[in-house]
Amino acid sequence: MTLFDATRSFGGLDRLYGLGAAKAIRSAHVTVVGIGGVGSWCAEALARSGVGRLTLIDLDHVADSNINRQVHALSTTVGQAKVLAMKERIALINPECAVECIEDFVSPENWPAVLGRGALPDAVIDACDQVSAKLVIAHWAKSHKVPFVSVGAAGGKRFAHKVDVDDLSQVTHDPLLAQLRYRLRKHHGAPREGKKIGVLCVFSREAVAPPDASCAVEGDGTLNCHGYGSVVTVTATFGLCAVSAILNFLSDAFIKAKNNAII
């Protein structure tokens, strides 16, 4: 069995971000809320980027219907808790990554207590699909100045090249993030039209496609498809874009701190 060599495994990040920033990434703690079609790819990309500590939050279990778009969904993991399946996968990618699994759904009642005591994470990715959870996470992250990315809805989207990253004020074609924007403005005084809200989002500028007509009522009166369709090329792109933003946050924070120290 070959011993794990972090220097060789993550040397590409040293050359891309610089030794200091890459070290900051490897010492970072990132929380991912929702380990599904988008969040599982976030966790995968963070582990492959050498992030040293991850907190994964989700209560769902892997199902057959997840196999088309979720990286931890395999024939061997069906029925397993998503956070545990992801932890096992990460151990094979980056054995030095410390992974904490929290089997729960985030809600206004348990956030941020669900994180436990101790230092705040260095960054958070919200990849859940509940507006109430997205709202409490976004407001908390802004209040505590924690780098944060909120991910929109990937269902009903086919074109990966239309995925974008922008401030919440500029998001289009995403009912989930539109609700987040509305509630931040209504309940927390977020800036109105024309001004940045300060919440970075991953979303698609593609219009949501309804389920195909072939997924209509069967002859026996049952449906053969449920909800919006989805494809891994889009869900993975959402997740990778979110992680790209977080890695840049961490790198930029290191560079800023270094420059301030010189001054």
What are these regions (language model features)?
Residues 1-31, 64:
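N-terminal charged helix/coil linker that caps or initiates catalytic domains
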Residues 62-65, 154-160:
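Short gly/pro/ser/thr-enriched loop/turn and capping motifs at secondary-structure boundaries
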Residues 32-34, 57:
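Conserved N-terminal Rossmann-fold NAD(P)-binding element of oxidoreductases
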Residues 102-111:
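Conserved SAM/SAH-binding loop
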Residues 51-94:
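Glycine-rich phosphate-binding loop and adjoining beta1-alpha1-beta2 segment
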Residues 2-4, 116-123, 130-136, 143-144, ...:
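Glycine-rich phosphate/adenylate-binding loop
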Residues 38:
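Hydrophobic/small residue at the entry helix of a nucleotide-binding pocket
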